[in-house]
Amino acid sequence: MVCIPLVGSSREEIMREAAGIPSIAPDIIELRVDAWEFIEDTAASIAMTREVREAAGELPVILTCRGHWEGGLKKVSDEAKFSLYREAAKEALVDFIDVELVYGDEKIREVLAMIAGSEIHLIVSFHDFEKTPPKEVVFSTLAAQIRAGAHVAKLAAMPRCEE
């Protein structure tokens, strides 16, 4: 599966990236809104999400506002992040919404309520770019993601050796 992240910060950069999607022929697109210079403005962010949705056509779109503590491109307020998630879910502009496991069960349940009755799926993610956690931690993290309500459990780690 090929996933192409769109990481432009301005509308022009984002649309330029979106215009190149057909030549790459990905299976899915990840909209990295934590790169957007206007991310704190929900109306502008929703308008941009609509434009990308239109440009993506039938390709599935993941809406991701990665926390800076897990590799996000900049600090984004929770208010802006979850307001965008709420509005994007209302309009069914995306196919997946990605929320970090660190937000905990209450916030994850809130996102599940946002997408209830829609065809949007929840990705619950965990990232460790310093190391690969021990096998037991990998399995317990994935289990926690599933218990929290993930439709897709995602764990990304940095390999440091061949083991």
Q: What is the role of each PLM region?
A:
Residues 61-99, 103:
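Glycine/small-residue-rich loop that forms an oxyanion/phosphate-binding "nest" at active or ligand-binding sites
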Residues 15-19, 42, 46-53, 85, ...:
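Generic structural signal for well-ordered alpha-helices
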Residues 96, 101-163:
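Catalytic alpha/beta core domains of metabolic enzymes, predominantly
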Residues 8-10, 33-37, 65-69, 101-103, ...:
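Active-site-proximal loop/turn and secondary-structure-junction residues that shape catalytic pockets
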Residues 28-52, 99:
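Glycine-rich, proline-tolerant flexible connector loops at the mouths of alpha/beta enzymes
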Residues 1-15, 67-79, 125-136:
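Active-site mouth loops of central-metabolism enzymes
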Residues 42-68, 111-124:
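Alpha-helix-loop-beta-strand connector modules within alpha/beta enzyme cores
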Residues 1-6, 27-31, 61-65, 95-99, ...:
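Hydrophobic faces of well-ordered beta-strands that scaffold small-molecule active sites
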